[in-house]
Amino acid sequence: KVNDYIVSFRENTINEVTESPLYINYKSNNYLVDCSCPRFGSGEAKGVLKETIRGTDLFIMTDVCNYSLTYTVNGHVNHMSPDDHYQDLKRIIAAATGKARRINVIMPFLYESRQHKRTRRESLDCALALEELNAMGVTNIITFDAHDPRVQNAIPLSGFDSFDPPYQFLKALFREVPDIRPDKEHLMIVSPDEGAMHRAVYFSNVLGVDMGMFYKRRDYSTVVNGKNPIVAHEFLGDDVTGKDVIIVDDMISSGESMLDVAKQLKERNAGRVFVCTTFGLFTDGFDKFDEYYEKGYINKVVTTNLTYLPPVLYEKPYFCLLYTSPSP
């Protein structure tokens, strides 16, 4: 889609200077580079560029959350993890052998973005990855709704852009549910935790409505699946009785905390509950979402097409897809 847009854009612009030597090779029928990352039987891989990229601005796009891709290790089929995608990204950069004029990485879901701070003896994987890409010659890193954009402090002299999609969320939601009334009496924005506060504050300021938030009480004495389990969600905010509620966050991982927040809002007599999240990972599947939709705890789940989404999701009655590029 990006390639088609560039081809169309350059076909319809600067027609009057096509003979200028400054615009040699400016127009082309294809801007995609033929590349691959084949693997050996042991699972090891290599990056291969099948055409020259010398002197070009190279843009590498990667979806580190696309688990639908597989490879074989000693006869066993493995699904690709974010670590595998990140390694392939570095392989393609290495295959360029420093010949590209500039290397730009477009990574919609920032690799390891949730591991952006240290609270105990643990690795700072996101900062480490950014430093590694910078050391390999990457000029710009483009991402969307980074979990914490301040992680760019790891590479203060390099380009780092994190684009947020609040306008696209509102446009998609208001088109899907046109009877939403954006005023203080009928709508409220809720942050599911303290980390998403800045998103909720922006939404509420733009719409001119009130905001509430939940904070998580955790059991710090135990670790389950790499994190301290949530004991309860406590709500801070005005009365939600009869109001439609929009819950905003950067991602749905398992969805457990998001669904618990939606349930608590309905128990507080909220009207309809809409979930807006940039990345729908759905790591525990859709059974719980189906159940909560049937019980009326959630009405819509709006997520972007910035990461891979399984085909079964498109059949869900509560699902609303947000296109961050021109829709087909």
Tell what function each PLM region has.
Residues 16-53, 112-122, 161-174, 181-185, ...:
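Short, glycine/charge-rich flexible loops or terminal/linker lids adjacent to PRPP-binding catalytic cores
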Residues 36-41, 76-94, 120-128:
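Glycine-rich anion/phosphate-binding loops
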Residues 55-58, 62-64, 68-72, 90-116, ...:
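Mobile, glycine- and charge-enriched loop segments
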Residues 57, 101-104, 139-140, 186, ...:
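Residues at the starts of beta-strands that form the adenosine-phosphate
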Residues 109, 216, 222-225, 263-297, ...:
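A short, conserved beta-to-alpha structural element at the edge of catalytic cores
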Residues 119-181:
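Anion-binding alpha/beta catalytic cores of soluble intermediary-metabolism enzymes, centered on
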Residues 146-149, 196, 304-309:
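Short, polar loop motifs at secondary-structure junctions
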Residues 323-328:
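Conserved small/polar residues in nucleotide/adenosyl-binding loops
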